[in-house]
Amino acid sequence: MLAAKNILNRSSLSSSFRIATRLQSTKVQGSVIGIDLGTTNSAVAIMEGKVPKIIENAEGSRTTPSVVAFTKEGERLVGIPAKRQAVVNPENTLFATKRLIGRRFEDAEVQRDIKQVPYKIVKHSNGDAWVEARGQTYSPAQIGGFVLNKMKETAEAYLGKPVKNAVVTVPAYFNDSQRQATKDAGQIVGLNVLRVVNEPTAAALAYGLEKSDSKVVAVFDLGGGTFDISILDIDNGVFEVKSTNGDTHLGGEDFDIYLLREIVSRFKTETGIDLENDRMAIQRIREAAEKAKIELSSTVSTEINLPFITADASGPKHINMKFSRAQFETLTAPLVKRTVDPVKKALKDAGLSTSDISEVLLVGGMSRMPKVVETVKSLFGKDPSKAVNPDEAVAIGAAVQGAVLSGEVTDVLLLDVTPLSLGIETLGGVFTRLIPRNTTIPTKKSQIFSTAAAGQTSVEIRVFQGERELVRDNKLIGNFTLAGIPPAPKGVPQIEVTFDIDADGIINVSARDKATNKDSSITVAGSSGLSENEIEQMVNDAEKFKSQDEARKQAIETANKADQLANDTENSLKEFEGKVDKAEAQKVRDQITSLKELVARVQGGEEVNAEELKTKTEELQTSSMKLFEQLYKNDSNNNNNNNGNNAESGETKQ
């Protein structure tokens, strides 16, 4: 469970365990941005009137890699600069950490990831999976917070004013711990997360905006780390989710890993060298695998060339391999197959057949893979729609929901569902459901339980999420104790357990003895999540990096201006070649080269002294002005001389 503040009402024998107490007010002031916090890439959007707009980042891209790196100088890089230096700094470059969010270290998925990433995944004191870089540990929510902050800064740069409110998306199949950890990520960087929206639902919002006809739409969302399938009924601005299903550990990262393993295996067969423990080599192969995967969506074959990947006594070794689309599809067939069952379950839960589906939307970068498109067509019996951009639809939908919450958009109603059944443990370790999966939220449900033994004065309420019949096979999301029950025969006390799920899909559970108004005590034991103190510490840490981040931002802006000056000066030199002093022109060319080298380092994510950059820019500006002033003077003198000569010749003729 998440560490939470628990309020005890002493006027009645009741106790309440809020798995998520840190709910934010939905009172909105200012702009509400929509953020798609993705496993591989993230995006941010805003509504401009009735039109949603994706905002480009400082590097000019519409999506930002969800990558955070820590340099040896202590600088934190986020996005493109972080991804660029991953090969030379693999142990301290954190990517795909969304897969760890809200997870326990012992989870099977986490144990698999430990073997597949170059950075360290460690066990936190509360049993959660955390990551380590440069000797410092971070929660996955904290890393997500750094990416959210980058999105926040991107929006602020575009809007020209501070942004406080956001709608953030999560995979539809995220459980309570993962949803709350996502809200924590926003809180860490000072974002008021007004709503957590399911990714496929957000994509449907992007698709259905301004559409008045009635449709049943399936959203097939295969992203970088997660897979979701949602069935929605869209009717004149009302978006009702009928069912959802998925796999929170299936996505593009897995396709990369399959190809990476194949490359490492082939290389070992060819050379006898095992690259498994060479982190720098593995990172190079990982990046090449990702690039090859993307290329194979539009071409039938690709080549992977990695010179000097390693060396032995006989000399340097290189990777030079060809992969056809057919080979890649055969290799990753088990991954594509894993999308089939969730689709069938979602249709069954919605009480629909494939013929009832009007359109199928493809969302997420992996949905571009031809084999995935073919599988979707086979499942639904129709070609999927290309009405939305797979990379941008989720962020756009989040912005639409933000505009709904701020009152800018009034003709949209979103009715989402809880993805997993919720219940408590009863006698014998049985999972007793109170709220079945795919129940429309917000919702509230109560049920009466009693004691399992005579004279029992307290009961432990253990809260689980899942679909199995025994609690041991489901996810424990919280537990608390209701104490002070008067001794009575077994089965006599009446204990009312209430589940209350808000619009974010976050859960409040309470227990009350209906027979007495005596005082009680409460004991809460957390299963996972960040405590308030930990969040506060992370907020402080984020502030520490603020000045560094600002310096980095200024360096990028200065570099962009310097690059513009260098290009303009270079073009002018070409235009007036032969008219300016050769020695002076060469001096300016040397300054241009020097400045461009510095700019390239900044754009490559390196730490560069801002003063040095500023000085070199000013020096080039001064030199170029002097040079072109001289050119202007020379031109003026030549014109004067010509005029004088013309005047003299005129007098002679007279």
From Swiss-Prot:
Listed EC numbers: 3.6.4.10
PROSITE patterns: HSP70_1, HSP70_2, HSP70_3
Keyword Chaperone: yes
Gene Ontology biological process terms from the UniProt entry: chaperone cofactor-dependent protein refolding; intracellular protein transport; iron-sulfur cluster assembly; mitochondrial cytochrome c oxidase assembly; mitochondrial DNA metabolic process; mitochondrial proton-transporting ATP synthase complex assembly; negative regulation of mitochondrial translation; protein import into mitochondrial matrix
Pfam families (UniProt xref): HSP70 (PF00012)
UniProtKB keywords: ATP-binding, Chaperone, Hydrolase, Mitochondrion, Nucleotide-binding, Phosphoprotein, Stress response, Transit peptide
SUPFAM superfamilies listed in its UniProt record: Actin-like ATPase domain, Heat shock protein 70kD (HSP70), C-terminal subdomain, Heat shock protein 70kD (HSP70), peptide-binding domain
Listed name of the protein: Import motor subunit, mitochondrial
Taxonomic lineage from the root: Eukaryota, Fungi, Dikarya, Ascomycota, Saccharomycotina
